[in-house]
């Protein structure tokens, strides 16, 4: 277990150093996270995890900071073609800005600001029983973002080893908006 945590720490430190080299990416101020978010992109080095019926094909609705520094989030996903909701709690780790979660394996992730505090990227490393994989989730405060911001995200994840075929633009699919409490219609 100690070896796993050491490897994980090294992965996240390297990812953070890479992020710091990009002008567009910064550590996110967690005090600003509470509220509605929309899933814009999913990207992974294991595409089947984010394809239709993949375990990581989830759509964010709300994220809230909890008093104990953990995060609470509500997500939607499709199960047998039906939209369903489920909550998650992300536990704060000892490393600043890093959270963990048991979901389809053990996950550790960092939240980074992208362009401004209206856009965030979750960089997640999953240690499942089969093999580890990385996942990038791009969230925004609005249901869609400009083509320029989308292009920037694609460049960022490609620099981190994700091939274009493993990047899914979620704005072009049903993201289960009908379950959201705000009445947003799917485009």
From Swiss-Prot:
Its main location: secreted. CDD domains: lipocalin_MUP-like (cd19428). It comes from the Eukaryota. InterPro entries: Calycin (IPR012674), Lipocalin (IPR002345), Lipocalin_CS (IPR022272), Lipocln_cytosolic_FA-bd_dom (IPR000566), Maj_urinary (IPR002971). The keyword Transport applies. Glycans are attached at residues 53, 68. Residues 1-15 form the signal peptide. GO terms for molecular function: odorant binding; small molecule binding. Keywords: Allergen, Disulfide bond, Glycoprotein, Secreted, Signal, Transport. Expressed in liver and in sublingual and submaxillary salivary glands. Highly concentrated in secretory fluid such as saliva and urine as well as in hair dandruff extract. Disulfide bonds join 83-176. It is found in: Secreted. It holds the Pfam family Lipocalin. One of its GO terms (cellular component) is extracellular space. The keyword Disulfide bond applies. Several N-terminal ends may be due to cleavage by signal peptidase at different sites or may be generated by proteolytic processing of the secreted protein. Analysis of the sugar composition shows the presence of GalNAc, Gal, NeuAc, GlcNAc, and Man. May be also O-glycosylated. Homodimer. Belongs to the calycin superfamily. Lipocalin family. This is Major allergen Equ c 1. It comes from Equus caballus (Horse).
């Amino acid at each position: 277990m100690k070896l796993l945590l050491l490897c994980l720490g090294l992965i996240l430190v390297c990812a953070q150093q890479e992020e710091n080299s990009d002008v567009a990416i910064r550590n996110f101020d967690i005090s600003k996270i509470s509220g509605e978010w929309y899933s814009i992109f999913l990207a992974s080095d294991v595409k089947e995890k984010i394809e239709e019926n993949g375990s990581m094909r989830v759509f964010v609705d709300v994220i809230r900071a909890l008093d104990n520094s953990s995060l609470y989030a509500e997500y939607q996903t499709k199960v047998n073609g039906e939209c369903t909701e489920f909550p998650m709690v992300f536990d704060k780790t000892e490393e600043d800005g890093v959270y963990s979660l048991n979901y389809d394996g053990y996950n550790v992730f960092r939240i980074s600001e992208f362009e401004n505090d209206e856009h965030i990227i979750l960089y997640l490393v999953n240690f499942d029983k089969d093999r580890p994989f990385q996942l990038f989730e791009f969230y925004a405060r609005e249901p869609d973002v400009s083509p320029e911001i989308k292009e920037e995200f694609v460049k960022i994840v490609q620099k981190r080893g994700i091939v274009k075929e493993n990047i899914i633009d979620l704005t072009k699919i049903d993201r289960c908006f009908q379950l959201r409490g705000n009445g947003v219609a799917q485009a």
